[in-house]
Amino acid sequence: MEKFITLFSTAVPLFIDNIDTDQIIPARFLKLTTKSDFGKNLFRDWRYDSNGKIKKNFILNKKKYSGNILITGKNFGCGSSREHAAWAIRDYGFKVVISNIFADIFKQNALNNGLLTIELKKDFINLIYKKIFLNPNILFEINLEQQYVKFENNKELFKIDDFKKKCFINGYDDIELLFSIKKKIEIFEKKNIYN
C-alpha cells in the first residue's frame, strides 16, 4: 500500500446522495481478477451513453474538474458489498473520498485498499461545494497525521481509527502492519505465553 501522510490536490465534486456500488462500477465489469484496470469503467453508465459516447455533462468528463479527491453526497457506497467499487475509484486516480456518511462495508473495503474515506459535517461539505463550483482550482490539504481537511481559510477535523491511520501513514495493509511488529509479538509470546 502507498504511504499517505499529507495530500495537496484539487477535487471533483459529485454532489449526489446514495450512490451505490453498481453505479460506481456496474456488475458487468467485475470479471477481472486483479485490482487494476477498473478505473476506466468508474461511473461507466454516467460517463458514457449506451453507444460508448462520452456524456459531456457528467462531472468526470469536464476538464475543469480534476484531482485526487472525490467529494460526494451522503451514504456513498451503499448497495452491494463489492470490493471492486473501491478498486475502481483508486484505479481511476482518487486517493481520498469525502462524504458526510459512507455505507459501512464500502468504507471498510476502501480503507483496506488504500482509499482514504473522510467523513465531514454536512455544513462543511456544503461550503466545499459552493466554493468549488465558483473555483474548480481550489487546492485542498488533507493532513492525516493531524486529521484535518483544509482549503482557503477553512479547516475541519475528521476522525479515523488509530489502526487504519497507522496503516496509511506507514504504507501497510493490515497483514503488513502485523509483520512489521513480528519481533515485538515474538518477545511478548516468550515472556507471557511460554512461561
Swiss-Prot record:
The protein's annotated catalytic reaction(s) are:
(2R,3S)-3-isopropylmalate = (2S)-2-isopropylmalate
- Origin superkingdom: Bacteria
The Gene Ontology CC terms held by the record are: 3-isopropylmalate dehydratase complex
Gene3D superfamilies on file: Aconitase, domain 4 (3.20.19.10)
An MF annotation (GO) of this entry: 3-isopropylmalate dehydratase activity
Q: Which UniProt keywords apply?
A: Amino-acid biosynthesis, Branched-chain amino acid biosynthesis, Leucine biosynthesis, Lyase
SUPFAM superfamilies reported in the protein's UniProt record = LeuD/IlvD-like
Q: Which CDD domains match?
A: IPMI_Swivel
What is this enzyme's EC?
Answer: 4.2.1.33
Q: Name one Pfam family in it.
A: Aconitase_C
InterPro entries, A to Z: 3-IsopropMal_deHydase_ssu, Aconitase/3IPM_dehydase_swvl, AconitaseA/IPMdHydase_ssu_swvl, IPMI_Swivel, LeuD
Q: What are the BP-aspect GO terms? A: L-leucine biosynthetic process
Q: Look up the record and name the pathway of this protein.
A: Amino-acid biosynthesis; L-leucine biosynthesis; L-leucine from 3-methyl-2-oxobutanoate: step 2/4
How this chain assembles, per its entry, is:
Heterodimer of LeuC and LeuD.
Q: Which family does it belong to?
A: Belongs to the LeuD family. LeuD type 1 subfamily.
Biological role stated in the UniProt entry: Catalyzes the isomerization between 2-isopropylmalate and 3-isopropylmalate, via the formation of 2-isopropylmaleate.
* Record-given protein name: 3-isopropylmalate dehydratase small subunit
Q: What is the lineage of its organism?
A: Bacteria, Pseudomonadati, Bacteroidota, Flavobacteriia, Flavobacteriales
Per the record, the gene is leuD
